[in-house]
Amino acid sequence: MSDKEAFTEHDWRRLLTSLGEDPNRPGLHETPARVAKAWKHWTSGYDQDPVSVLKAFEDGAEQYNELIVVRGIPVYSHCEHHLAPFFGKATVGYLPNGKIVGLSKLTRLVDIFSKRLQVQERMTMQIANALMEVLEPKAVGVVVKCRHMCMESRGIRTQGEETITSCMLGELQPNLALRTEFLALARD
């Protein structure tokens, strides 16, 4: 067990004790280890380089010059303000400029950034900026729609509200027709 896991497991044991629970009782005995493992998974994006997943193909398809859009990409993250989960779907698209990536790479990119403590607005921009930096496409668009448990389970306690963020780079900024096409493809 690494120092990071042991420290985290110890902290979860202390949290249970501070709540008045007995971390050694049957239902909680293994909870600190399980929670430590879960948080390691939920924050594994810090150990991954987004650039490494965006290797361009060289198979002839790089001549494709229309929008490539993947929608319905799962987002599971935790807000950096309360450590509360937020979850939803992302749509990622780009207009290639001689380089394309496998479609699953867009999903992996979203996964890397969502497995960090985040705010949705920054995560949306990070996804778009990474794609723009590595592929140098003519345009990038990212739309993220999530429910935030920090709003639903505490504070205002509203159920089912969704927050939608977007980031448009390159030709999607000035080109209204291209932006409209991307947003139409991004709709559920």
Predicted stretch roles:
Residues 1-188:
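A domain-level signal for the structural core that forms small-molecule/cofactor-binding pockets
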